[in-house]
Amino acid sequence: MTNNTMLISLSTQPADARWGEKATLSVNEQGFTIHVGTTSLNGKAALATIQRAARKIDGQGIKHVTLAGEGWDLANSWAFWQGYRGPKGQRTVEWAELNDADKKELNDRLKIVDWVRDTINLPAEDLGPEQLATRAVDLLCDVACDAVNYRITKGEDLREQNYAGLYTVGRGSERQPVLLALDYNPTGNPDAPVFACLVGKGITFDTGGYSLKPSGSMDSMKSDMGGAATLTGALALAASRGLQQRVKLYLCCADNMVSGNAFRLGDIIRYRNGKTVEVMNTDAEGRLVLADGLIDASEQNPQWIIDCATLTGAAKMALGNDYHALFSFDDELVAALQESAKEENEPFWRLPLEEFHRSHLPSSFADLNNIASGAHTAGASTAAAFLSHFVKNYQQGWLHIDCSATYRKGAVDQWATGATGLGVRTLANLLLSNAK
């Protein structure tokens, strides 16, 4: 411990009255004390208090701290870091002593979840479709290189191989669209069955296309690749925890731009599974690129297909930035994810998805419209329903996550502005605890 570090301790005792009613922070000559407001240093309420207190400490410009005294287990240490970390500037934490397993887990989270947050926070100028794909490869090779093989398909090769949705959305940008197909196979057996396929939306900037977003909706669209980053992090964390099952990762990466070559309203996309889609809103592009990844995933016949995307504003209207929205026809898979989310203390909430939602996308010229008709306003549910048309066995083993808790446009009491990394640990846990 150095002399210029601030000590941070935990207490179940209330703060002295001079610090204010229900104060969560007090100061003495040794440093800060976080008063968790409960009789235990463990539990959901204590974790939230620690995270909020860490945000306040960072807000005071304190960039070097030492976690001192009792109570700094893995969960509390991680809660502190989630609140303390910000998108700019360096912060140094001297951690309390942990056992070897918890120390490894903490270090893996610091590496992988912080990679997710940093990647989502990158400006679009620095992160195009191909850069996103190569960053994902670099992370997974760093974690488990011997188990990783991958293929990157881009530009005209996508068109020639009939990746119609991804090519159509990405063709309007000078930066070529890219599909990353990564095979994590720790068994070493090329004939091993695929346990799960992960399909991520990787729109590295979304103008909305000709259905142009206003500035207030476009200013955070560097984060529209949050689903791809989250799934990459989840697979990396699961691998670091010892995942022994084969998993394939598909990242559908593109810019959605306006240009003379960009796709237009009224265009019809013809997919490899025989479905045709009429484009009536170019700002509903995420589902168009995911469709290609879901077709590939279905061809692998995995037990599970999990897609993750910053897909709709409707999910954010329902849940804010506080929960990821969860959709599935498979109640058992939903229950498994919710149990994993509870164990990792991460927020997921199930929203409706019923068979009738699949009929809410009529088109006069194609099998499907890429947006629901005006009479059907359940935007998040109909977006999920659209995706179901590209999953062969959509009623079983398929999970769609509309990841509305990925990014915050402004700071709140628990989070700095920017990416949160929420969902990475839950999905890693799900892959591990339910792989047979």
UniProtKB/Swiss-Prot annotation:
HAMAP family: Aminopeptidase_M17 (MF_00504)
Functional description taken from the UniProt entry: Probably plays an important role in intracellular peptide degradation.
InterPro entries: Leucine_aapep/pepB (IPR011356), M17_PepB-like_N (IPR047620), Pept_M17_PepB (IPR008330), Peptidase_M17_C (IPR000819)
Highest taxon above the source species: Bacteria
Subcellular localization: Cytoplasm
Protein name: Peptidase B
Names of the cofactor(s): Mn(2+)
Gene that specifies this protein: pepB
NCBIfam families, A to Z: PRK05015.1 (NF003450)
Catalytic center residues: K213, R287
Residues annotated for Mn(2+) 2 binding in this entry: K201, D206, D224, E285
